[in-house]
Amino acid sequence: MDFRAALEQLKAALQRPLPGAGAHRLTAPRPPRQWPAGFDQANIRHAAGLLLLFPVDDRAHIVLTVRADTLGRHGGQVSLPGGVVEPGETFEAAALREAQEEIGIASGPVRIVGALTPIDIPVSAFRLHPIVGAIDERPVMRPSDDEVAAILEVPVDRLLDPASLIETERLRIRHRFGLRSE
């Protein structure tokens, strides 16, 4: 998809009401994860991620990261560059700061286009606020070795192609334990 056309289409879509949880269900794990019984939602931690739109050979792309395996519960997962919102920080500022920390993108040339519906992540008690940004040229990206295993540049037309959306079942068993020496 042409970068300028994708950007205009996205701007127009962000002027309408967002589809919210219905859109999330299309790609959510089955069964969808819920907040644990008795969980006090006042304890939700807020995070922000940058959904950055940029051109590669005039085709619209977004950037995703593969998180370093050393990063707790979400290590090895594909994600938006992003992280915890610091006290007094806006979601937009947090998304830009985290993108700079994780993939080395300077925030100056990034234009904030809007925000998508927040996504709850019960396993780690986070609510992720996706912030949409755009930049007019392919950014130079350098992954933070501590946080990012790989940077993925994903063509938007692949994401919009129904043939790219496949349903799979995946089982991942992960257990950490420590060893003591005497």
Annotate the PLM regions.
Residues 165-176:
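Acidic, negatively charged sequence signal
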Residues 141-167:
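Acidic, glycine-rich loop-and-strand cores that form catalytic or ligand-binding grooves
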Residues 1-79, 84-101, 105-139, 148, ...:
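N-terminal leader/linker segments that precede catalytic domains of diphosphate-processing enzymes
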